[in-house]
């Protein structure tokens, strides 16, 4: 009985092998090369990890990651650090000479600047405008009285 049950599997293997032989014969070498490149690209991009970035590629990556905040080439140091410093490593040392990831790039982004609220801008404009108008009014008034001419505002 073992031979009878294995007969369909042998038949399937034979037919499948014949099918592959025909398909491989029809497929040209350029198709095989294209298929191999697609498979390599897919497998390498799926497992992409840290990579080295130098020159314009490094700057482009920092601009993309940091956006409008900007970035530093050296890590910003805190206030009150001792006068004896260890040699600083910059983004070039970390990402060009060695590989770095997205988190490492983000460490070199400048901090977000606190945005002024709309209310404080309105309050500032409100206090600035009368002062400027008052100065113009005083200048025009002094001209008008000195030259006996009537100036209109």
Swiss-Prot record:
Gene Ontology terms describing biological process: cell population proliferation; insulin-like growth factor receptor signaling pathway; negative regulation of apoptotic process; negative regulation of release of cytochrome c from mitochondria; negative regulation of smooth muscle cell apoptotic process; positive regulation of cell population proliferation; positive regulation of D-glucose import; positive regulation of glycogen biosynthetic process
Localization per Swiss-Prot or TrEMBL: Secreted
Gene3D superfamilies listed in its UniProt record: Insulin-like
Chain spans, region C: 78-89
Cysteine-cysteine disulfides: 54-96, 66-109, 95-100
Molecular-function annotations in GO: growth factor activity; hormone activity; insulin-like growth factor receptor binding
Positions of the pro-segment in this chain: 119-153
Pfam families reported in the protein's UniProt record: Insulin (PF00049)
Keywords: Cleavage on pair of basic residues, Disulfide bond, Growth factor, Secreted, Signal
Region (Disordered) residue spans: 120-153
Composition-biased stretches (Basic and acidic residues): 125-138
Region (B): 49-77
Comp. bias intervals (Polar residues): 142-153
Subunit structure: Forms a ternary complex with IGFR1 and ITGAV:ITGB3. Forms a ternary complex with IGFR1 and ITGA6:ITGB4. Forms a ternary complex with IGFBP3 and ALS.
Role this protein plays: The insulin-like growth factors, isolated from plasma, are structurally and functionally related to insulin but have a much higher growth-promoting activity. May be a physiological regulator of [1-14C]-2-deoxy-D-glucose (2DG) transport and glycogen synthesis in osteoblasts. Stimulates glucose transport in bone-derived osteoblastic (PyMS) cells and is effective at much lower concentrations than insulin, not only regarding glycogen and DNA synthesis but also with regard to enhancing glucose uptake. May play a role in synapse maturation.
Protein's recorded name: Insulin-like growth factor 1
